[in-house]
Amino acid sequence: MTLKITRRAYAEMFGPTTGDRVRLADTDLIVEVERDYTIYGEEVKFGGGKVIRDGMGQSQRESKDCADTVITNALIIDHWGIVKADIGLKHGRIAAIGKAGNPDIQPGVTIVIGPGTEIIAGEGMIVTAGGVDTHIHFICPQQIDEALNSGVTTMIGGGTGPATGTYATTCTPGPWHLQRMLQAADAYPMNIGFLGKGNGSLPGALREQIDAGAIGLKLHEDWGSTPAAIDCCLGVADDTDTQVAIHTDTLNESGFVEATIAAFKGRTIHTYHTEGAGGGHAPDIIRVCGESNVLPSSTNPTRPFTVNTLDEHLDMLMVCHHLDASIAEDIAFAESRIRRETIAAEDILHDLGAFSMLSSDSQAMGRVGEVILRTWQTAHKMKAQRGKLAGDPNDARGGHDNFRVKRYVAKYTINPAITHGIAHEVGSIEVGKWADLVLWKPAFFGVKPSLILKGGMIASAAMGDANASIPTPQPVHYRPMFAAAGGALARSSLSFLSQSAAQAGVAERYGLAKTTAVVRGTRAVTKAQMIHNDWQPSITVDPETYQVVADGMLLTCEPAEVLPMAQRYFLF
């Protein structure tokens, strides 16, 4: 016997299905479900009088044949698709994406539910991969809570705490600091990788940092990003299969942008804040996003371009780079980095896929808890100003924005993971990867997640009063969960190491409790591997007006006066 119900009734019961559309938060972005992996009439749902009961949707099978956890009827948004499915987790990893249930009585089951299976209700929820923030100044450990509760589950960068060098540069310099920071990372429910200091013209002091556990090296102008240092650093990276990130020479002291590009010698490099307000050759560092070997990212204070963007940057610069407002040269240095024309162009270069990643620059001209939020604000602003992308349809119902959404979600998930050699572990919702997953109510998408899973276990959640009779009474705020406690923390999160450090037994020598994973495959990555974000335009910047032209097209847009995902979400 079959029962027909309306689409609305179905969506309210089991979540949206193929062809249904969902608005993301209060933006203009609409996604359409491309495929539903569940089977109509055989959906599983937990609760009184529902499906997942003994002998019904739950089988009698032992745990070895069943998922540890199933997220039911979830709307997955990832770079590879926007689909409805059940998600099975096993041993902290994603085991299957498909149809959950009891194969003894149900057809098409690919994820077995048994007595040993926990259920997370995904009906009406969106699931994304945990974010990967690759521009972290480890100034204070409290950043980790802020990042985790925003949906970021991996942090890559450098620092040693509130030291002057760390305020300005993402470097954990030298073997001693790397050892101590890796030991400190054991205490936090976050995947973490550290970058050593890459500014040196001889390889010895750089190589020893990789051997001590750094997963890459950071070149920063405050330490001297000279052509010699760039060349040496990239040579060490090639020898060790690690990545290099660079903040180039704003003052053009040791050469202009052409000299820096020449020093790259075609080798892969991750350019931080490639627009330049965060630092880099003034006024035309933005040119490098057209190079095939350059993997360009933005930091979030310029995302998106608004009426307030320019005003806040000067004070941020003075603090972060240890400048003195009484020195005219320091003021000139700061002002040279803040250009409305290149910031406006950055919006468009993101929308067209020339800028491949987005990160925070935490407490050093960026906000660690706003990577995801500002990514989607940028996507909204570009749709509002530029209309639909060529890859998105426009029909009688107004069409959808699936391609644009895939482009933007890739900027803080899979592309930074590919860039830093960790995409075999994290960065997407794919079978075999670490189960770092974020669940959102659509109305709060990109702003306030409901659950954050680390390694298949809930690490943080928006939770009500712990003394209440039910979980929902106020005050509801983010609270650490069991994956953030005791021995579970070490098994639920990763510390990333270089291959040479892993082979040398660094984890055992340092006494690390956390699960370790190695970075690999960084040196062969090119812009072409940046998913949905691989455009390589030829860019020129007018040295007088700062106007940006890409492949003959003038890139300009107005600053936003009002944004979604803003004050209405943060009244309490």
Curated annotation (Swiss-Prot):
Q: Which PROSITE patterns match?
A: UREASE_1, UREASE_2, UREASE_3
Gene3D superfamilies linked: Metal-dependent hydrolases (3.20.20.140), Urease, subunit C, domain 1 (2.30.40.10)
Among the GO molecular function terms of this UniProt record, one is: nickel cation binding
Key words of the record: Cytoplasm, Hydrolase, Metal-binding, Nickel
What cofactor is this protein dependent on? Ni cation
Reaction(s) catalysed by this chain, per the record, are: urea + 2 H2O + H(+) = hydrogencarbonate + 2 NH4(+)
| Annotated localization | Cytoplasm
Which pathway does the protein contribute to? Nitrogen metabolism; urea degradation; CO(2) and NH(3) from urea (urease route): step 1/1
Please give the name of this protein.
Urease subunit alpha
| Annotated organism of origin | Ralstonia nicotianae (strain ATCC BAA-1114 / GMI1000) (Ralstonia solanacearum)
Source species taxonomy = Bacteria, Pseudomonadati, Pseudomonadota, Betaproteobacteria, Burkholderiales
> Which gene carries the instructions for this protein?
ureC
